[in-house]
Amino acid sequence: MTKKIKTLNLNFGPQHPAAHGVLRLILELDGEVVEKADPHIGLLHRGTEKLIENKTYMQAVPYFDRLDYVAPMNQEHAFALAIEKILKINVPIRAQLIRVMFCEIGRILSHILNVTTQALDVGALTPSLWGFEERETLMTFYERASGSRLHANYFRAGGVHQDLPMGLAEDIGNFCESFPKIIDDLETLLTDNRIFKQRNVDIGIVTKEDALDYSFSGVMIRGSGVPWDLRKSQPYDCYEQLEFKIPVGKNGDCFDRYLCRIEEMRESVSIIKQCLSKMEKGPIKSLDGKISPPPKKDIKQSMEALIHHFKLFTEGYRVDKDEIYTAVEAPKGEFGVYLISDGTSKPYKCKIRAPGFSHLQAMDYLIKGHMLADVPAVLGSLDIVFGEVDR
């Protein structure tokens, strides 16, 4: 007598602590083995792209902080670059260095959270406690520069909102001296840890060809052996003046992606040090009064400055009729902004290309044939944040 084997359907999330947000995965299980994984997204959809259409270019910046809210300034960077390309604005070198420095701080913020929570998902508690301590220091730097720990609203078309406060550059420099020791300590806990390796080596393997077919970017494609990094291949701001290496994996598994993130943190520290050494006094935003607000002291003394300020904050600046795509190397991968302007002070359309969206699409391919307990390990190595996936 033949027996028909029935698979079991299991809901993973949306309230599971390892789902990293509001992911709902419908898993089809044959015993402990995952036969199929069906991600259901949209539980954090806020209509960001539509909301941006009703805001001026300056008012739209905070929406980008709320996409990948682990490293907010990296998204603002893409939007600022898109406007600058259409308006053909030259950004002062000091502003470029400040922007690159804070983008690399964002990369460390994102990677340290991912590496430590991935370890937490497979049972290692200590790294996350150490990691959050370092993230606290970095968020204090964010707060001192922009006034906000998380949603910075700091980058502007033509530069940054305000200059670095007194003593911040020195404190960031001191952090760069002490942080590599923390990375070494994390590696001591995890890299040669037998349990951590058993949970990550040969799990969620992605070949070079499949990584390209699924349009992976960032660590997901570099972990599979493709040395693709927009900071090198399509440099923006002052990245071509900086020296750094691109860590590349061999096997394309969860462990290689973890190693890539660890090495990228070291490279980010090196980039921040270079930015600090190159930084000299100078303007921190475009001097065009039609785009950048005047300094506060000028508003009290000059009628022209007062008019510029009033027009900028009521009507906003007009952007020439054009369309453009700009992409930056965000911590999760290629974050792109496709901006269409119709000559008014509000975008006609702003399409956002979130890297996490492409990575989550491959969840079924990545987890098929693995055990149920491997789902959090694979999901952790994808580095998903739902602000940008659901938009």
UniProtKB/Swiss-Prot annotation:
GO terms for molecular function: NAD binding; NADH:ubiquinone reductase (non-electrogenic) activity; quinone binding. It catalyses: a quinone + NADH + 5 H(+)(in) = a quinol + NAD(+) + 4 H(+)(out). Its EC number is 7.1.1.-. The keyword Nucleotide-binding does not apply. It is found in: Cell inner membrane. It holds the Pfam family Complex1_49kDa. Its main location: membrane. InterPro entries: NADH_Q_OxRdtase_suD, NADH_UbQ_OxRdtase_49kDa_CS, NDH1_su_D/H, NiFe-Hase_large. Keywords: Cell inner membrane, Cell membrane, Membrane, NAD, Quinone, Translocase, Transport, Ubiquinone. Gene3D superfamilies: Cytochrome-c3 Hydrogenase, chain B (1.10.645.10). The keyword Cell membrane applies. It is a peripheral membrane protein. GO terms for cellular component: plasma membrane. It is an enzyme of class 7 (translocase). It comes from the Bacteria. HAMAP family: NDH1_NuoD (MF_01358). NDH-1 is composed of 14 different subunits. Subunits NuoB, C, D, E, F, and G constitute the peripheral sector of the complex. NDH-1 shuttles electrons from NADH, via FMN and iron-sulfur (Fe-S) centers, to quinones in the respiratory chain. The immediate electron acceptor for the enzyme in this species is believed to be ubiquinone. Couples the redox reaction to proton translocation (for every two electrons transferred, four hydrogen ions are translocated across the cytoplasmic membrane), and thus conserves the redox energy in a proton gradient. Belongs to the complex I 49 kDa subunit family. NCBIfam families: NuoD, PRK06075.1. This is NADH-quinone oxidoreductase subunit D. It comes from Pelagibacter ubique (strain HTCC1062). The lineage of its organism: Bacteria, Pseudomonadati, Pseudomonadota, Alphaproteobacteria, Candidatus Pelagibacterales.
